[in-house]
């Protein structure tokens, strides 16, 4: 019915003090919160969003009491590595359920550009009936798919595309996302040397060489898997990259047959891959993006 966002990167100290001072009296807590935010939640199904919750761990700890209170639903968002690290002196609430958030897929991208009623039903019908679309329709759909691949599925990038921004402006948005990724990787690397950052930077090169598996020798000629496995796991768990692990037998319990030392890494988003490849350029111009849409996107498939 309604929602409220508490962005702890921007909230003033009075809002934060309310969490510290009034958890034992939730009537007072909500009264103060609504007064400080200038808004009262109305309706039976309302949600309060704790954005950048890693910046204020006390709010995360308060979830235990707020959920038990039952008045509202709660969503927490934030940087995975900082959420993991900023837990000193707080009790991590068992009421938390982690939900993985993925980039928008092709169907969701089509929803965003108001094409939810044409392309996907056409593809689905052709697939179910095993009926070809014809060259003209196939070309039209593939152009839309290639556009999705270069824009990618990050909501900010898709929003920029839908808003009519140029490809150069969309590329700027994606460069900013990559910079945020690099900051998270750097935080990890402060305790683990420069392992995750180097691995992440080599993903496009690894894919371009079409190796059957990720070659750690391209990271460091003396590298051993056991010295880098935690960094690889972090990249995968943070969903900055997608880890594909070899299995020795195609059985139901794949985990029993996983050969974790034999793996490949892919970028988590094709649009970010395109921008990562072009990162040595100051910006990526319109003509280059249009050329990519036409014929040059095999690297992340």
What are these regions (language model features)?
Residues 159-301:
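Accessory nucleic acid-recognition modules appended to NTPase machines
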Residues 68-89:
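Sensor-1/coupling segment of RecA-like P-loop NTPase cores
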Residues 3-44:
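Short glycine-rich substrate-engagement loop in P-loop NTPases that contacts/grips substrate
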Residues 40-59:
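Conserved P-loop NTPase "ATPase switch" module shared by AAA+ and STAND
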Residues 16-19, 53-63, 86-87:
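Conserved ATPase-coupling elements of RecA-like P-loop NTPase cores
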